[in-house]
């Protein structure tokens, strides 16, 4: 992905400054908000990457959308604008979140279900992840109706698949490979 290396460098610098100013948590909240908003708004992403739109317009739009930003986050936006890198703002935000989580020993857990999870089930899953990994986790929920039921949990390179579709595939494979029943 274009700009990822630069985004990592900006994120590292922002995190370093935020740690020095004891604002890492507040900046993380800003970055989560920025990342979600830019990813969910194609128009905003297009505006940020457009060479036709003036930087002053981009800055005023960002400050209007994100009214309660930390001064460090505002400074980061200014630096990105000055360096002509505002188009990678969402990548910087994503990299900041990753680095912040690494710093705080928080792992990313991705749970895939056929239906949305309620808050109680999310809490149970997070406690199980903490029990299994020994570290805190943030939960990302993905809805995939193809798994039919159950769930698939991924934490780092570990995966636990308790989906109905997996069990059906396993059953199908066992029936096809059954040596006791002659092939019809």
Curated annotation (Swiss-Prot):
Keyword Secreted listed: no
Membrane topology term: Peripheral membrane protein
Record-annotated disulphide pairs: none
Family: Belongs to the ATPase delta chain family.
Compartments, as annotated in UniProt: Cell membrane
The name this protein goes by in its record: ATP synthase subunit delta
A GO cellular component entry from the record: proton-transporting ATP synthase complex
Single GO MF annotation: proton-transporting ATP synthase activity, rotational mechanism
Keywords: ATP synthesis, Cell membrane, CF(1), Hydrogen ion transport, Ion transport, Membrane, Transport
Native organism taxonomy: Bacteria, Pseudomonadati, Bacteroidota, Flavobacteriia, Flavobacteriales
PANTHER family linked to this entry: ATP SYNTHASE DELTA CHAIN (PTHR11910)
Coiled coil location: none
Principal localisation: membrane
Its biological purpose: F(1)F(0) ATP synthase produces ATP from ADP in the presence of a proton or sodium gradient. F-type ATPases consist of two structural domains, F(1) containing the extramembraneous catalytic core and F(0) containing the membrane proton channel, linked together by a central stalk and a peripheral stalk. During catalysis, ATP synthesis in the catalytic domain of F(1) is coupled via a rotary mechanism of the central stalk subunits to proton translocation.
Provenance organism: Christiangramia forsetii (strain DSM 17595 / CGMCC 1.15422 / KT0803)
Subunit details: F-type ATPases have 2 components, F(1) - the catalytic core - and F(0) - the membrane proton channel. F(1) has five subunits: alpha(3), beta(3), gamma(1), delta(1), epsilon(1). F(0) has three main subunits: a(1), b(2) and c(10-14). The alpha and beta chains form an alternating ring which encloses part of the gamma chain. F(1) is attached to F(0) by a central stalk formed by the gamma and epsilon chains, while a peripheral stalk is formed by the delta and b chains.
Gene assigned in the entry: atpH
InterPro entries referenced in this protein's UniProt entry, alphabetically: ATP_synth_OSCP/delta_N_sf, ATPase_OSCP/dsu
């Amino acid at each position: 992905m274009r700009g990822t290396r630069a985004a990592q460098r900006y994120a590292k610098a922002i995190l370093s400054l935020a740690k020095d100013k004891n604002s890492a948590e507040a900046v993380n909240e800003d970055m989560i908000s920025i990342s979600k908003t830019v990813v969910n708004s194609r128009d905003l992403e297009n505006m940020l990457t457009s060479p036709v739109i003036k930087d002053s317009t981009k800055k005023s739009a960002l400050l209007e959308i994100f009214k309660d930003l930390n001064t460090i986050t505002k400074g980061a936006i200014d630096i990105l604008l000055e360096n002509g890198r505002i188009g990678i703002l969402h990548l910087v935000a994503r990299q900041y979140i990753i680095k912040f989580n690494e710093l705080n020993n928080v792992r990313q857990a991705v749970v895939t279900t056929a239906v949305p999870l309620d808050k109680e089930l999310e809490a149970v899953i997070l406690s199980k992840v903490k029990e299994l990994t020994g570290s805190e986790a943030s939960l990302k929920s993905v809805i995939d109706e193809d798994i039919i039921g159950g769930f698939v949990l991924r934490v780092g390179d570990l995966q636990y698949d308790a989906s109905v579709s997996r069990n059906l595939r396993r059953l199908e494979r066992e029936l096809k490979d059954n040596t006791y029943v002659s092939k019809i």
